[in-house]
C-alpha cells in the first residue's frame, strides 16, 4: 500500500464503482434504514482508506467495494454482509478497532468484521510459517482449518465474505 493524493480520475472510478454497488445492494435492503447503513459503511471505509493505493496504483477503497459487490451479486447476502465487506480492511489496515466498528455499526456487523480479521490472522500466520517440517506444517494447516471451521459455528457469512475477498 502507498499514499498519494487521489486524482479526478480516481474519484470518478470510486464514484462509478460505488454507484454500481448501490444499484446491486438496494434490492437486498428491506428499507431505507438498511440502505443508509450501507452508505454509512462506504463513507466510513472510504474516509479510512483516503489517498491509500494498492500496489497496482488503484485507490484502495476499490477492493472493499468489489468484495461487497461479489457478496451481494454472486453470493446474495444482505446489507449486514455488504457493510462488513466494505469495512473488512478498516480494522486490518488502519488505526480503527473492532470496538470502533461496534460503536458505529452495531454488534452484528462488528462481529462479522472481527471474524474476517481473525481468519486473515490465521491465514497470514500460516503463510509465515513456511514448509520447514512437513509434519508440523500439516499439523499447523489442520489447526488453522479447524479454527476457520469454528468461525462457521459463529456465522457462516464470515467465510462467505472471506471467499469473496
List PLM regions with ranges.
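Active-site helical microenvironments for divalent-metal-assisted chemistry
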Residues: 1-164
